[in-house]
Regions:
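Alpha-helical interface subdomain recognition
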Residues: 18-158
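A short, charged helix-loop
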Residues: 1-19
């Protein structure tokens, strides 16, 4: 069988679902990391009022907020993928990670766009691909409200 011996149809679908969410988590982690690196380079090289943008307090604060989102996503993705890879119960981790992706990844990308100014929305600029992929992933996961409902249902059934 595709997903292992001894699995019935429902178990196979559940396993495939867990693998898909884990893969999305890992992909989202790399996506935000790449977009953050691109933005960090941009604000270090772009000058305004004779100084790099990165030296302005408001820019540093916004990058710091995105960094917190990125680190949280990284830890959540790592935990989810590790639990799935070990065959452990990963459903809680996967639900929380999927919620974090749907709720926090698109706003983080908006901040990174803001820090790029007008260049970030140019379809030929790399940030555009990062951002459009982030939006697609959030939609693929069902959006933040749907994911929060799943997390809430899981918590209320404890």
């Amino acid at each position: 069988t595709l997903l292992g011996d001894g699995l019935d149809g429902a178990e196979s679908v559940a396993t495939l679902y867990r693998l898909a969410i884990a893969a999305t988590a890992a992909y989202s982690d790399g996506l935000l990391s790449g977009a953050t690196d691109l933005t960090a380079r941009h604000v270090s090289e772009r000058h305004q009022f004779g100084k790099p943008l990165a030296t302005f307090q408001a820019v540093a604060q916004q990058i710091a907020d995105v960094y917190v989102t990125a680190r949280t996503l990284h830890v959540a993705a790592l935990s989810s993928v590790w639990r799935v890879s070990r065959g452990l119960d990963a459903d809680d981790d996967l639900d929380v990670t999927a919620y974090w992706i749907a709720a926090e990844l698109p706003p983080a990308m908006r901040v990174l766009h803001h820090l790029h100014g007008g260049i970030g929305v140019d379809a030929t600029y790399p940030l555009h691909r990062y951002s459009s992929t982030a939006k697609d992933l959030a939609r693929w996961l069902g959006g933040a409200s749907y994911r929060l409902d799943l997390v809430g249902a899981r918590c209320s059934s404890i």
